[in-house]
């Protein structure tokens, strides 16, 4: 990269700046260290810094070069530090006849030493001394550092002599790594060269295994902290898996082991091919571009690519919308593909280290191998071997000789429980072009793949390796289209391909009985569908495969399933089942969470869709896996209870047992179960309590919660309290439950939800029940904020106290809500098109109003309040939150108990609700490019 490419003269003119400072010094009346002179020098340097950064940002916007920008910013800093240090040593604290001790080298270390910076990057400096520090040296260091700090820079520094550097590098791997990146800036160059030579001879030589092992362990620990997957939808560009630090780690390792200074030398050594070097440089350039834009856009050292800045970064990088994908999603897909490339490079370099050169270094193989190097054949043709519990290729040409071996490798690894040798994965990555239409249609390849997908062992692990190597996306091109695809919303925590793999992992865990407590029904049902278990694995792999297309992904996905299943070897009837499951994979979740399960019409309609018990079982398990694999905290016990209720109610219809008597019998059974748990209560009191809740309460609420509610209500009655709240944290589900007992009235739900919002509680779910004596028992789930249950319980009790104060008139709700009208920062990045549907076909008795919109504090209170103001009675409400989006369903009648059938009145209701929902959407673009949004 030439200076012409960098256009460094446009960043800062070193000679002009140096001359300006010297002229200021020559004409100054004050001492060079005086406060007035110091202010002049500082302002001159600050102006140059601001101008250089602005120029670097302008150039980045024009040429898009991330590496160019990082080098330009580094050059800017080099120039300012060089001139400042020169001023400090020749003007502020000059030495007429310096002794040997009064020499110093200023050295860039760490990230700054590597020669690239973003605007907010730390500046790590080493003031290198020949001996001990001197008074002159202390003055120079202090002057330089304070000037840099006053310029607003984050400067890390150390002042050491060479002996101290060597001793500390031997003891501390972080210091050793920082010195590995050391780069001379200014001062005594011979002093720096001495450090380089001694570092090479006394530290690096003979310690290669130790260093590499430490760096790989450090990388693994960093991944665990930042998130194991490289496909988190708000990735850390610097520290996350597949981010900049992974590239740094690779170069540290190769630099330490091969004694190279540049990546280009790795091609000459055979570690990387020219294509792989190009991949390395492209990944580095892209990550630098993203990181530099993030720092410029946020005016701080922002390393997390959060939802609220993704749209601006995508715009800066020039992404536009395509059919089915907005511009943010296209940008993030590119990001995740680059992260995947970084993973490929990691495997390639590890393979080269182990196989090409490491055998010449005593002890190196201990980094990778725990056991002796025993080999055994894994296949009759000798194409694969097991080497120290890892599968490897016996010859470099086995994939070219028979491309089916690219699938067979994974099949054998699964069957024998082997890890993958990096050499085998490297060879796979370099052979992807062999996967063509012939291989995709090969019956043997598809048979092997289906056995991998439906393996009784750990299919997710093998499929993950297939995906990481690129084989899965090439073998199933439709899957390749969703690799690294993110969905620009706060609900989905992972990319689409990562979600599908996690779905398969959940199913495998259910099948192995590992989720028996959390998912008892799924755990039971999986044992009854052995003949159809394969269909579930195929469905889970395919159910979101059509994401990112203009049409409904369920319908498009069903069409893809119809095409792929015969290729995998499924029969026509099996194909039909998978096609149906893919098309309906969202139905059970939607009905369970958004419909009244105590309404006969809900169950009848759902049963008409499902039609058979076999499909019902498959759909239930599919739904559980799908929800659970969305991300942490998405699944909770209440969703499980709703799904189980829907399953059991539908089972009665499909088996011919659905009747009011059956419901009554189940209600009776539930009341008897509760009576048994309350056996220590006096009979008269127990019977009176059991008559309070209506049937829907007993059919929806778990027995443990019923017992808890019973004691809660009993205690309130004994204390003579008509209004009381109770809090219960649920650590595993990342939610906290607040139960409210209060006299029922038309706007009660609106007041409760408003008070909750005013207290900072983000409502994610709610259950509403009334009792036969005119009281309401409402249970609200709010997002968890604290890690410990004690802290979270105290916080929830404060929320409960606010609810009590508002309901009792001690606090004024409108004033409280006015203080919390701003949506969360992340939510401000999104737009959800408001939608209101008024439907009289979903219930025989009620009109169902379904609203969809952008979540915001107090929205549920506003909705329920408006519905009450429209002279409607809410019989039940079903609140569902999908990240930034809410979908709420209200079962309503007019004040005399009739449906809302008048078209004019329906139009008025819809118009007012849409106005309320649209109030916060404003000009947000939901990730569409400005052109597309216009």
From Swiss-Prot:
SUPFAM superfamilies xref list: ACT-like, Nucleotidyltransferase, Nucleotidyltransferase substrate binding subunit/domain, Poly A polymerase C-terminal region-like
Name of this chain's protein: Bifunctional uridylyltransferase/uridylyl-removing enzyme
An MF annotation (GO) of this entry: phosphoric diester hydrolase activity
Keyword Nucleotidyltransferase: yes
Enzyme Commission identifier(s): 2.7.7.59, 3.1.4.-
Domain remarks in the Swiss-Prot or TrEMBL record: Has four distinct domains: an N-terminal nucleotidyltransferase (NT) domain responsible for UTase activity, a central HD domain that encodes UR activity, and two C-terminal ACT domains that seem to have a role in glutamine sensing.
Cited function: Modifies, by uridylylation and deuridylylation, the PII regulatory proteins (GlnB and homologs), in response to the nitrogen status of the cell that GlnD senses through the glutamine level. Under low glutamine levels, catalyzes the conversion of the PII proteins and UTP to PII-UMP and PPi, while under higher glutamine levels, GlnD hydrolyzes PII-UMP to PII and UMP (deuridylylation). Thus, controls uridylylation state and activity of the PII proteins, and plays an important role in the regulation of nitrogen assimilation and metabolism.
Region entry Uridylyltransferase, spans: 1-379
Uridylyl-removing: region residues: 380-736
Biological process per Gene Ontology, one example term: regulation of nitrogen utilization
Catalytic activities: [protein-PII]-L-tyrosine + UTP = [protein-PII]-uridylyl-L-tyrosine + diphosphate; [protein-PII]-uridylyl-L-tyrosine + H2O = [protein-PII]-L-tyrosine + UMP + H(+)
Entry keyword set: Hydrolase, Magnesium, Multifunctional enzyme, Nucleotidyltransferase, Repeat, Transferase
Regulation: Uridylyltransferase (UTase) activity is inhibited by glutamine, while glutamine activates uridylyl-removing (UR) activity.
Domain ACT: 737-818, 848-931
Location of the HD domain: 496-613
Pfam families for this protein: ACT, GlnD_UR_UTase, HD
Swiss-Prot/TrEMBL cofactor(s): Mg(2+)
SMART domains: HDc (SM00471)
Family: Belongs to the GlnD family.
């Amino acid at each position: 990269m030439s200076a012409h490419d960098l256009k460094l003269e446009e960043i800062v003119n070193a000679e002009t700046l140096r001359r300006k400072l010297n002229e200021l010094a020559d004409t100054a009346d004050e001492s060079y260290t005086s406060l007035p002179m110091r202010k002049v020098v500082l302002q001159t340097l600050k102006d140059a810094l601001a101008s250089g950064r602005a120029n670097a940002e302008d150039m980045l916007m024009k040429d898009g070069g991330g590496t160019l920008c990082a080098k330009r910013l580094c050059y800017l800093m080099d120039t300012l530090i060089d001139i400042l240090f020169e001023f400090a040593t020749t003007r502020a604290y000059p030495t007429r006849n310096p002794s040997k001790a009064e020499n110093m080298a200023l050295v860039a270390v760490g990230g700054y030493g590597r020669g690239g910076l973003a605007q907010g990057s730390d500046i790590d400096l080493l003031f290198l001394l020949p001996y001990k520090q001197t008074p002159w040296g202390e003055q120079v260091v202090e002057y330089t550092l304070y000037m840099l700090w006053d310029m607003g820079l984050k400067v890390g520094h150390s002042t050491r002599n060479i002996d101290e550097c060597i001793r500390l590098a031997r003891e501390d791997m972080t210091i050793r790594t920082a010195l590995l990146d050391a780069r001379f800036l200014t001062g005594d160059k011979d002093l720096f060269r001495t450090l380089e030579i001694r570092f090479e001879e006394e530290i690096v030589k003979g310690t290669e295994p130790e260093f590499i092992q430490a760096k790989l362990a450090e990388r693994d620990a960093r991944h665990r902290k930042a998130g194991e997957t490289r496909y988190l939808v708000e990735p850390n560009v610097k520290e996350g898996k597949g981010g900049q630090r992974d590239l740094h780690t690779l170069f540290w390792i190769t630099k330490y082991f091969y004694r190279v200074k540049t990546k280009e030398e790795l091609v000459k050594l055979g570690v990387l091919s020219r294509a792989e070097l190009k991949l390395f440089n492209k990944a580095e350039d892209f990550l630098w571009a993203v990181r530099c834009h993030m720092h410029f856009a946020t005016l701080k050292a922002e390393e997390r690519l959060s939802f609220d800045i993704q749209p601006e970064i995508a715009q800066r990088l020039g992404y536009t919308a395509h059919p089915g994908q907005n511009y943010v999603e296209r940008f993030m897909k590119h990001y995740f593909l680059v992260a995947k490339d970084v993973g490929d490079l990691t495997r390639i370099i590890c393979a080269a280290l182990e196989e090409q050169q490491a055998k010449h270094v005593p002890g190196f193989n201990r980094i990778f191998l725990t056991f002796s190097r025993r080999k055994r054949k894994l296949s009759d043709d000798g194409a694969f071997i097991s080497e120290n519990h890892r599968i490897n290729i016996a010859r470099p040409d086995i994939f070219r000789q028979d491309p089916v071996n690219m699938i067979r490798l994974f099949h054998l690894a699964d069957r024998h429980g082997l890890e993958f040798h990096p050499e085998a994965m490297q060879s796979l990555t370099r052979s992807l072009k062999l996967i063509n239409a012939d291989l995709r249609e090969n019956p043997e390849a598809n048979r092997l793949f289906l056995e991998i997908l439906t393996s009784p062992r750990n299919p997710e692990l093998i499929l993950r390796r297939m995906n990481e190597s690129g084989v899965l996306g090439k073998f199933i091109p439709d899957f390749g289209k969703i690799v690294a695809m993110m969905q620009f919303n706060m609900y989905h925590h992972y990319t689409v391909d990562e979600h599908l793999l996690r779905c398969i992992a959940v199913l495998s865990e259910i099948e192995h009985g590992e989720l028996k407590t959390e998912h008892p029904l799924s755990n039971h049902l999986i044992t009854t569908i052995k003949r159809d278990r394969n269909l579930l694995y195929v469905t889970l792999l395919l159910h979101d495969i059509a994401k990112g297309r203009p049409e409904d992904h369920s319908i498009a996905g069903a069409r893809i399933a119809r095409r792929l299943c015969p290729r995998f070897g499924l029969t026509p009837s099996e194909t039909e089942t998978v096609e149906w499951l893919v098309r309906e994979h969202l139905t059970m979740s939607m009905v369970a969470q958004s419909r009244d399960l105590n309404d006969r019409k809900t169950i009848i309609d759902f049963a008409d869709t499902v039609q058979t018990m076999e499909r019902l079982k498959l759909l239930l398990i599919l739904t559980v896996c799908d929800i659970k694999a969305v991300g942490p905290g998405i699944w909770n016990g209440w969703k499980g209870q709703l799904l189980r209720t829907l399953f059991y109610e539908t089972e009665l219809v499909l088996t011919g047992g659905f009747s009011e008597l059956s419901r009554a019998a189940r209600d009776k059974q539930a009341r008897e179960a509760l009576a048994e748990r309350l056996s220590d209560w006096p009979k008269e009191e127990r019977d009176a309590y059991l008559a309070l809740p209506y049937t829907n309460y007993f059919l929806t609420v778990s027995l443990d919660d019923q017992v808890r509610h019973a004691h809660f209500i009993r205690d309130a009655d004994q204390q003579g309290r008509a209004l009381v709240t109770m809090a219960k944290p649920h650590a595993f589900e990342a939610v906290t439950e607040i139960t409210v007992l209060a006299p029922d009235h038309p706007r009660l739900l609106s007041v409760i939800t408003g008070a909750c919002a005013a207290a900072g509680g983000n409502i994610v779910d709610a259950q509403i029940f009334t009792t036969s004596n005119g009281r309401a028992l409402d249970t609200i789930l709010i997002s968890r904020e604290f890690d410990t249950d004690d802290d979270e319980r105290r916080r929830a009790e404060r929320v409960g106290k606010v609810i009590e104060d508002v309901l009792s008139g001690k606090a004024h709700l409108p004033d409280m809500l006015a203080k919390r009208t701003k949506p969360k920062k992340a939510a401000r990045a999104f737009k959800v098109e408001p939608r209101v549907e008024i439907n009289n076909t979903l219930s025989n008795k009620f009109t169902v109003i379904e609203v969809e919109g952008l979540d915001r504090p107090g929205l549920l209170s506003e909705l329920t309040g408006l519905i009450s103001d429209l002279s409607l009675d809410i019989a039940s409400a079903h609140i569902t939150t999908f990240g930034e989006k809410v979908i709420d369903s209200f079962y309503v009648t007019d004040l005399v108990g009739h449906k809302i059938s008048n078209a004019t009145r329906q139009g008025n209701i819809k118009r007012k609700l849409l106005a309320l929902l649209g109030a916060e959407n404003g000009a947000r673009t939901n990730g569409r490019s400005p052109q597309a949004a216009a």
